[in-house]
């Protein structure tokens, strides 16, 4: 369900209106609407653009060959050129040939599209799933080198990479090979005004919308799920969501012991009084809290905060329960 991302859409449209020159990383807290935004962006592009939107979420990728196969899709012989694809269309039977040098094939393919007067837009969603694959060297570095060649060197295609994994993004942000060759675009949860507009425009009363904002904040996935549970009172839904999220955080905390547990509790306790804090080097407690989707780290701003408003409430309740249990 798409709603009021005109500012972000305008920014994305501005990026593709000029010659390709940088890789654009779209990032943000979990479930903040990055995928939905990029799909809507793809739909709105004029016919001069051809979009290749490849989502790696849920794909079983164990080695480089698996990733390359995900990039491509079988092309029917009679199929005409479309505006949008979920993979790079190739004739049946040539995949093994492409596996020998996939990046050369893609470069020549995008060059062919350019020569026809159209502009390729490559979107890779949830790219972090290949972050640690090693074949000769890290696949991710091969891929970044290729993206730099497509954008900065050859100006053949616009490249967008989306991720909710802020540890992966931290690694990318500090990567020397991408300095001056990449930009970062935050896709955040809705603010209060947008949240209230979204909920009231979809049937909730102003009072119900304010209750939802108090508990859930502006995370689109939570709000959409709330709207789909129309038979449940808004406050009941919100309290149940908070109970469930608190239990999830407690389950994660119960796996820790000793010094690490104390350090994580010390970190999370800072959010009783603060919505966000600054951070320096990534400590083990920050890495753990981010990896368990409790906190969101923004490497561009060096800010650390709960993944959302619901998570902030759940952190407070989880810490209270821990104090009562020990």
From Swiss-Prot:
Nucleotide-binding listed as a keyword: yes
Recite the UniProt keywords alphabetically.
Answer: ATP-binding, Nucleotide-binding
Stretches of the chain forming a coiled coil according to its record: none
Taxonomic superkingdom: Archaea
Annotated Pfam families: ATPase_2, MJ1010-like_2nd
| A single MF term (Gene Ontology) | ATP binding
Q: Does the keyword Hydrolase apply?
A: no
Sorted alphabetically, which Gene3D superfamilies does this protein's record hold?
A: P-loop containing nucleotide triphosphate hydrolases, Winged helix-like DNA-binding domain superfamily/Winged helix DNA-binding domain
Per UniProt, where does ATP bind? 28-35
Q: Which family does it belong to?
A: Belongs to the archaeal ATPase family.
* Name of the protein: Uncharacterized ATP-binding protein PYRAB12000
Organism field = Pyrococcus abyssi (strain GE5 / Orsay)
């Amino acid at each position: 369900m798409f709603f009021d991302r005109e500012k972000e859409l305008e920014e994305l449209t501005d990026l593709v209106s000029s010659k390709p020159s940088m890789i654009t990383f779209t990032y943000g807290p979990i479930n903040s609407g990055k995928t939905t935004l990029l799909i809507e962006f793809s739909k709105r592009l004029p016919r001069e653009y051809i979009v290749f939107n490849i989502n790696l979420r849920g794909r079983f990728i164990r080695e480089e060959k698996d990733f390359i196969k995900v990039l491509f899709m079988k092309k029917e012989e009679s199929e005409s050129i479309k505006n949008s694809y979920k993979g790079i269309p190739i004739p049946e039977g040539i995949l093994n040939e492409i596996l020998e040098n996939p990046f050369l094939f893609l470069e020549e393919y995008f060059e062919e599209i350019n020569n026809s007067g159209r502009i390729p837009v490559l979107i890779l969603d949830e790219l972090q799933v290949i972050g640690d694959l090693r074949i000769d060297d890290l696949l991710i570095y091969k891929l970044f080198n290729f993206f730099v060649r497509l954008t900065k060197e050859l100006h053949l295609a616009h490249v967008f990479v989306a991720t909710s994994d802020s540890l992966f993004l931290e690694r990318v942000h500090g990567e020397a090979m991408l300095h001056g060759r990449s930009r970062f675009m935050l896709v955040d949860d809705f603010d209060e005004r947008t949240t209230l507009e979204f909920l009231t425009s979809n049937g909730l009363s102003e009072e119900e919308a304010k209750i939802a904002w108090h508990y859930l904040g502006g995370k689109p996935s939570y709000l959409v799920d709330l709207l789909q549970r129309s038979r449940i009172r808004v406050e009941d839904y919100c309290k149940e969501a908070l109970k469930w999220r608190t239990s999830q955080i407690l389950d994660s905390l119960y796996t820790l012991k000793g010094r690490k547990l104390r350090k994580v509790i010390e970190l999370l306790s800072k959010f009783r009084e603060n919505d966000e804090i600054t951070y320096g080097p990534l400590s083990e407690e920050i890495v753990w809290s981010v990896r368990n989707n409790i906190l969101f780290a923004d490497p561009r701003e060096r800010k650390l905060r709960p993944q959302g408003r619901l998570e902030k409430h759940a952190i407070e309740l989880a810490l209270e329960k821990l104090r009562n249990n020990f």
